[in-house]
């Protein structure tokens, strides 16, 4: 895979659940999006993990996840890899990974999520973390 392609994000239209929406990677299957979610940070971490059939974590394990700055707040860096089941009974995508940040910002749950082929997600993680630090919530 050409590493240079993981750094080119194609802007896609926003959708009902995606405030910002991008595609990345040589395969064309990598996605990055920003959304506001229901529930707690822990609820959303476990939802992401479940999409990869990874075990749920508890509050103590949540505290041990790496911290990342996003929208002037501190979020939790979440990663998993394997067979991605995605939302709403989407077809299983083997060999995929997720990386992202989930934070409580101003009483809302802000998520920045990257999903795609594992090698492409791994290569783009530093770009995603840098992007997280640039996000701001509108007043």
Language-model segments: residues:
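Surface-exposed amphipathic alpha-helical segments
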Residues: 1-9, 107-139
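Secretory pathway targeting signatures of secreted, lumenal, and periplasmic proteins
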Residues: 2-54
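Second-shell loop/turn segments in exported
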Residues: 31-38, 88, 114-122
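Active-site beta-strand termini and strand-to-loop segments that position acidic
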Residues: 22-26, 80, 103-105
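Extracytoplasmic/secreted envelope proteins and their assembly/folding machinery
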Residues: 19, 42-49, 99-100, 125-132
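Sec/Tat-exported extracytoplasmic proteins
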Residues: 13, 36-38, 49-56, 106, ...
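Signature of long, low-cysteine stretches enriched in small and polar/charged residues
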Residues: 46-103
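Structural recognition of the beta-strand scaffold that forms the well-ordered cores
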Residues: 33, 76-79, 110-113
